[in-house]
Regions:
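...captures the hydrophobic TM-helix bundle architecture rather than a specific catalytic motif
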Residues: 1-220
Length: 220
């Protein structure tokens, strides 16, 4: 279980080191985000082969929100789709990190750039690995925040600053639809966990159809 939890945590550790100690490490600050993302890639490859061999994971770490019978946990799920997306995210992120070493060389914001990049990877992995809709929304919001920070990285330039603000505003439109969808799912199924929603979905849809006089088995 620890192996899977380290997939998002390694890039987050790289973000913390580059973000907190970047001004002391200078360009060496890039080593830590790169190591974290490459480490996440190696663990993602291992997770992929675990899934190929029949291993599936749906584990909760702790209860995030608990009100009466309703609870939302911080947990990760790894299935076939997740395993593939982990490979995609960590492969692309590793290549971008390595390429950026030369691309950003000499820039005064070098450590800050790699901190943002590692944080972006962390939130993307949270989005991919989340086992409930609320945690996935947190990952989505984090990706949106990091997109704003990266697009407006050279904030001294008006064009970059304006582009960052524009991206932030556009993402908020998507957030509104996301929040409505999550609320509708909760009102319909009484839970936000993927496994419980997907297990209840066929029954719920069938009941709605029958109430409207539609019989799926007769629609041939």
């Amino acid at each position: 279980m620890l192996k899977y939890a380290l997939i998002p945590l390694l890039p987050f550790a790289g973000f913390l080191i580059a973000g907190l100690f970047g001004k002391y490490l200078k360009e060496k600050a890039a080593y830590f985000p790169i190591a974290g993302v490459v480490g996440a890639f190696i663990l993602s490859v291992s997770a992929f082969f675990d899934v190929v061999n029949g291993v599936k994971l749906n584990e909760n770490f702790y209860s995030w929100i608990s009100i009466g019978t309703f609870s939302v946990n911080v947990g990760f799920q790894i299935d076939q789709l997740t395993a593939v997306m982990l490979l995609v995210v960590t492969t692309l992120s590793s290549l971008i990190h390595i390429y950026s070493v030369g691309y950003m060389h000499g820039d005064k914001g070098y450590p800050r750039f790699f901190a943002y990049l590692a944080l972006f990877t962390f939130f993307m992995l949270v989005l991919v690995m989340a086992n409930n809709f609320l945690l996935m929304f947190v990952g989505w919001e984090g990706v949106g925040l990091c997109s704003y920070l990266l697009i407006g990285f050279w904030y001294e330039k008006k064009s970059a600053s304006d582009a960052g603000i524009k991206a932030f505003v556009v993402n908020r439109v998507g957030d509104f639809g996301f929040v409505l969808a999550v609320l509708l799912i909760f009102l319909t199924f009484g839970t936000l966990d993927f496994s419980e929603v997907f297990a209840s979905a066929p029954t719920s849809v069938g009941m709605r159809h029958e109430r409207k006089g539609y019989r799926p088995e007769l629609a041939v």
